[in-house]
């Protein structure tokens, strides 16, 4: 399973990229707004850091305007993937962009039915939201399992990006189920690096090393 980072903070992206653990980035209007910078400038800077798919989301809700925005965004860099909301208008835009060989990531997926429709429309990626489902008492991991099964049975080539990741357990479970990708906040990537027994082990090694004579 590939790991993307879910952020628009270029410092976080650099740190994750320097660790060699990510191969793509997902952003959205909320993440861009947190940075307080020009949208296209941020996206361009991200493409300079990570050599992989960079998802940038359209703002329009009408399909013709989505297509227009998408055509402008892909001019920024060859790695740009257009994030499209899972709506009827969004599916129309995905169909057109797919015919133009512009990659799309259909976002705000909360059911297997939505994922199937997005794939049929020609989406390159679908992004089911685990954490938000968990927040309302539903099972986000179960959704990933359903989509993985359907895509395998139907030989669908659309890749699954597990999104709205809240902790390391989400990442591990998605990997076990066969999700192609998980897009992970920086803080969760940091959490994945840590374990109390690792810290204890390092402390013990250092203490033992201090007792070694003639180092």
From Swiss-Prot:
Its main location: cytoplasm. GO terms for molecular function: aldehyde-lyase activity; transaldolase activity. The keyword Transferase applies. PROSITE patterns: TRANSALDOLASE_1, TRANSALDOLASE_2. Pathway: Carbohydrate degradation; pentose phosphate pathway; D-glyceraldehyde 3-phosphate and beta-D-fructose 6-phosphate from D-ribose 5-phosphate and D-xylulose 5-phosphate (non-oxidative stage): step 2/3. It catalyses: D-sedoheptulose 7-phosphate + D-glyceraldehyde 3-phosphate = D-erythrose 4-phosphate + beta-D-fructose 6-phosphate. GO terms for biological process: carbohydrate metabolic process; pentose-phosphate shunt. Its EC number is 2.2.1.2. The keyword Protein transport does not apply. The active site is at 83 (schiff-base intermediate with substrate). SUPFAM superfamilies: Aldolase. It is found in: Cytoplasm. One of its GO terms (cellular component) is cytoplasm. It is an enzyme of class 2 (transferase). Transaldolase is important for the balance of metabolites in the pentose-phosphate pathway. Belongs to the transaldolase family. Type 3B subfamily. This is Probable transaldolase.
């Amino acid at each position: 399973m590939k790991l993307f980072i879910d952020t628009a903070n270029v410092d976080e992206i650099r740190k994750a990229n320097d660790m060699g653990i990510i191969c793509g980035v997902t952003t959205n209007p909320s993440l861009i707004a947190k940075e307080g910078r020009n949208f296209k400038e941020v996206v361009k800077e991200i493409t300079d850091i990570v050599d992989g798919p960079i998802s940038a989301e359209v703002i329009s809700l009408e399909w013709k305007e989505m297509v227009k925005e998408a055509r402008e965004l892909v001019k920024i860099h060859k790695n740009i993937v257009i994030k499209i909301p899972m709506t009827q208008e969004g599916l129309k835009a995905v169909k057109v962009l797919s015919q133009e060989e512009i990659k799309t990531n259909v976002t705000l997926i909360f059911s297997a039915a939505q994922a199937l429709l997005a794939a049929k429309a020609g989406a390159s990626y679908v992004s089911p939201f685990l954490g938000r489902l968990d927040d309302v008492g539903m099972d986000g991991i179960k959704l990933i399992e359903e989509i993985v099964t359907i895509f395998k049975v139907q030989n669908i080539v659309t890749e699954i990006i597990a999104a709205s990741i809240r902790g390391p357990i989400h990442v591990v479970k998605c990997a076990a189920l066969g999700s192609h990708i998980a897009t992970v906040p920086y803080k969760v990537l940091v959490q994945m690096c840590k374990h109390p027994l690792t810290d204890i082990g390092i402390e013990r090694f250092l203490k033992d090393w201090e007792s070694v004579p003639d180092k």
